[in-house]
């Protein structure tokens, strides 16, 4: 590619042709990734009969405007069979609507690890049993699929409202303590699926049920591994001068996750740990990470640290944006001392808040309505009226910023009825306003007509 095109303006066809010629491979079907809209889905179905293991792969892609029917994509799928024989990684090229992988001469059904290293940007429809996901979590040598297995196990516990299995907790403990695994990978693996992603996995969204179940799973993870989180926090300190390299960054990420988990577990000394880290930090990651723990868990040093942070960085607009956003996205305390919305209303009166500044508006209003789903989605009209009032106010200041905020209720019809009624009322309230910008009017009408 560089030999042919260095210094030139080239097309996607030029790029693909260079790859094809270099590898002596026909990639004409692969170009459908450029010409067909949408994300392909691949359904995986398994069978194991009389020593023969068969995987049936079926690809599809939903209709999009102007493209009702899609031709099969060229989908490269890396896979490995975990079990007898320790099968090596292989590449399967899915080029037809349906194809099969067949392996004979086996005595036991293997565990399939597919789309390894995220070899294709697809949605994989594959309902593996929890026992097999646990095997992937413990034994797979592919980091992506190991992470994916953990995410699926976490998600099932959250959506089914059940605690984490004892065997899963033991496996997670072993992973956390494993010295051969990268700290950054551990940080990603232990981060639970976001509430917004969980919304996409259910037919009817009950935001408070999802929020509560997610909190409970994280609390179990924190308490069951409290000693291990303390070990992780102590083991991944980065003394000396600040280093921006990947290894140091990974240690900081895992250390801050460990601090968060210690707070969630109720560890008695976490207030002092977080306060000390905040005061001694020589980098923003550690200082902000400690501040986030103090604020999210309403620890005793939270207010003093917030004031100190503001005083220290008040001349740096981007950092003060983070300061506002942290308070707007504060998690709902189990004790529910004060609503986050009340915090946001109080912060609106802060001398550094200016709703006419797009970044500042996003750091507070958007952060609360779009990034703090557990606090925003309440079965009452209050938070939705707050949202509507700010969409209207921003409509007269910056229609583009208002239109982005207006999308917070795009999926209102998928929510439980006791939320829907208040969402619809808020949407209709906006739609009746005069002088709505075309940007905002389009978003609101599209939502109401969906």
Task: Spell out what each predicted region is.
Residues 1-4, 10-40:
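Catalytic cores of secreted or luminal carbohydrate-active enzymes
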Residues 2, 104-450:
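Long, ordered, helix-rich scaffold segments
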